[in-house]
Amino acid sequence: MIFSRQSVKFFSASLLLILPVGLNVSFADSEKPVLPKGEAFHVYLVLGKTGMVKPVAAPEEMEPLERCFLLSAEGEWEQALTAGDNIIGSAGGARTGPLPSFAQAMLKQDASVTIGLVIRTQPETNIEEWGMKTKAYRAARKAGKTAAKDGTLKGILWQGSGAKSPLFTDLDHLKTLFSNFRTDLRLLNLPVVLGEAPKSKSATTQIRALADDVHATASVAPGAGGSGYAQAMLKLHREWPDDLPAPEPDIPLIDPHIHAMANKPGGLDPVVAWMERNGIERCITSPIGDSRPKNAQEREVMLANHRKYRGKIERYCLIKPGEVSSVEEAVKILEAEKAAGAVGFGEHYGHDLMFDDPKNLILYEACAKVGLPVMFHIDASKNMVEQGMRRVERVLEMYPDCKIIAHAYWWLHLPDGTCDRMLSRHPNLYADVSGTRMVGVLNRDRGYTREFLNRHQDRILFATDAGWWSFKKPKAERELQFELFEQLGLSDAVKRKIYRDNAAKLFGFE
């Protein structure tokens, strides 16, 4: 069937620059397409600048591209139409470039699959405008999650560079971008194919370096066309198949960072079920928010819950900055907590304080005197630091007997070498790998991560930051740390230290 240009709703050029292809205005006599589900529907995200698909006026005549659909701005799948090198949704908004021939090449390889294309390119943007909190990133992530409900995400196609800041290169931004996508889409090995930059040798050099440094990533030379992208993508599919079962740790785990409603009757029972599903032998709860006892009655409930699971579920204790005015006052409280079973202090938030604020120093010194390791949180409003984290180093130097466990945004300093330097200089510093963002940082450059973990294998702690909000999630949606650490190529001896031995030694379990 051939469609005329007049049968397509045509939009102005200015609108085409803003909205992706395939707006949800369909033919009057058409019906919503029936798509195959799951493994038979292969979905690709098309991101970056418009090199893959440049906006053009719709051709006079178009033909359906069988087994190929486009995702509209409203999240609806529409039949793809083609005319030569042009591809268009049934609602208008033609694009030209390598994408049509990519789709045709992928369809030719396997007659049993259908292709879904999610075009979220951004004209006239550079790589710096694809940060995790930008509109471009959020729109692409949302579209990717929407598409994944209907099919199987099989890869990302990217064209674009143009970093302007002297602090971070294209390579820095691209590594972070794709690790963020892989983490947020829960596909740690999602293939990525990038087009090299025909007008920038420096950008092309960095794109090639990215393909060398980052797993499941390839680059395509200018002029390779859609078939070149297809060949690169198919090669990654062979090297990084997505139908393999997720590897499982075969070492009993210790997780020193979870959150449970231990102050409520039966509040630790869900923890036990979660531990059994995930092969966790022992864990430590951290009292945050509503899980921290508010009165003597809740405290007694918490202590009773932990007595029930003594030797299996341990606990941190907590004093908030400002709740005590002297080291002596803090020591008295912490000694009582330790006598009642606390094995550490945390999660220390330090709301609206710099990391080395005097109110925080009271707590660090008291923990050093009592012998409780401190697990801290860092972000833009808690225990705040600058680049280089000199404030954290100052505390480590002031209290060498205080064992301090890094968490949260501390890990964001891994790529620039700060984390490596700090662990090398300060024997009282440890780091737990809990939290979603930490998975992204560690998956960003697996070669560097592997070297880092091997170098500091005695002071890295496996942890998840799981909580009452996640204990009942199915195994397929559990924390990604379980999957990632089995894919890093670490030796059994190193994994054993990270999975359990380091925590056992630090908290005195063995």
Map each language-model feature to its residues.
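Histidine/acidic-residue-rich catalytic or RNA/ligand-binding cores of hydrolases
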Residues: 202-205, 230, 264-268, 385-393, ...
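Bacterial N-terminal signal peptides
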Residues: 12-22
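Mid-domain alpha/beta scaffold segments of enzyme catalytic cores
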Residues: 240-359, 366, 370
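Structural recognition of the beta-strand scaffold that forms the well-ordered cores
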Residues: 42-47, 53-54, 78-81, 114-119, ...
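Mid-to-C-terminal alpha-helical segments outside catalytic/metal-binding sites
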Residues: 240-247, 252-254, 267-282, 286-289, ...
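Bacterial N-terminal signal peptides that target proteins for export
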Residues: 1-14
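Catalytic pocket-lining loop regions of alpha/beta-barrel enzymes
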Residues: 343-344, 354-462
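Cell-envelope and extracellular/periplasmic
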Residues: 29-239
